[in-house]
A protein has these predicted regions:
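N-terminal transmembrane hairpin
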Residues: 1-126, 209-289
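Structured inter-helical modules in multipass membrane proteins
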Residues: 108-219
Length: 289
């Protein structure tokens, strides 16, 4: 089995799902909705990337803990005081809100990781290349910038270690800072050179002189139409009828989730369900050979 079932859907289907999932993850502050978004994003990221996604999740854990701790330090609001340290109140409401903010940030990181894996630059160009060509190109370049810089940073560090100039964990802070500055300098030079080469290549190929075209032609099938309708139905019902109200200050007040919460979970699980369904079918077919 090659690829992912949801990745092979029409770009409109993929973009609609990620737009709804990321927007809801950023807006909803109810713990139940946040946990659902975080778990569904982590599940789909694991299905797409496997062990690499697991390593990224471990790296995201310190960031989550940092955001959880920072909010109670700078925001002493709330009625239920847990303890007092250095004259500042650390409240249950402030700590809970810090956990929520950290969860929102991490869940959006996972969703954007899945987005970069599923919605490639060619799919994004297919959707918006003819409507907003300059903006679509800018967004594509920005979305691929972080993964590209991360990959190049790893290459530069590996190359420096091979020639004996890299910093190890046991080195002093000065040595590690010097190594980091050298890597950053080389990374900046490489990025500037690539931007010049990209600009020259685009001018040589006649960028902006004619209507944009796509490398691959995507056609909306009946399956894509049904999936898109299901996405819109689940998302609309979850937004209109969901009980997602949450207040953290001055006291913690949470709405009790109703039946629409199940629709929200079903919406977030659509890509994972398609992936698992296809994987099961593939293994069944292989077992019959």
């Amino acid at each position: 089995m090659r690829g992912d079932a949801f990745s092979r859907c029409h770009p409109v289907v993929c973009f609609t799902f990620f737009f709804g999932a990321i927007a809801c993850s950023a807006v909803y502050q109810h713990p139940a909705y946040l946990i659902a978004s975080l778990l569904c994003a982590a599940l789909y990221d694991l299905l797409l990337r496997g062990r690499r996604a697991g390593r990224r999740m471990l790296l995201a854990l310190p960031l989550f803990l940092l955001l959880c701790i920072l909010n109670p330090i700078f925001n002493p609001a709330g009625e239920h005081v847990l303890f007092v340290w250095l004259g500042r109140n650390f409240t249950l409401e402030s700590l809970t809100y810090g956990v929520v903010i950290g969860g929102i940030f991490v869940s959006m990181l996972f969703w954007f990781d899945c987005y970069n894996r599923v919605l490639t630059s060619d799919k994004f160009t297919t959707l918006f290349g003819n409507l907003i060509p300059s903006l679509s190109l800018l967004l594509v370049m920005v979305l691929r910038l972080i993964p590209e810089l991360t990959r190049r940073t790893a290459q530069l560090r590996g190359a420096r270690r091979c020639i004996g100039k890299g910093a190890d964990r046991g080195d002093t802070l000065r040595v590690r800072l010097s190594d980091g500055v050298a890597v950053l300098s080389a990374l900046t030079d490489r990025a500037l050179e690539d931007s010049v080469v990209t600009g020259d290549s685009m001018r040589a190929r006649g960028y902006g002189t004619a209507r944009r075209s796509s490398f691959q032609i995507y056609r909306m099938t009946g399956r894509d139409g049904l999936l898109l309708a299901l996405e819109l139905l689940l998302l609309t019902a979850a937004v209109l009828f969901g009980a997602s109200d949450a207040e953290y200050f001055p006291t913690l007040t949470l709405a009790r989730p109703n039946w629409a919460f199940a629709l929200y979970c079903a919406y977030l699980l659509l890509p994972s369900a398609l992936h698992i369904k296809e994987a099961v079918q593939w293994h069944i077919l292989r077992s019959k050979l």
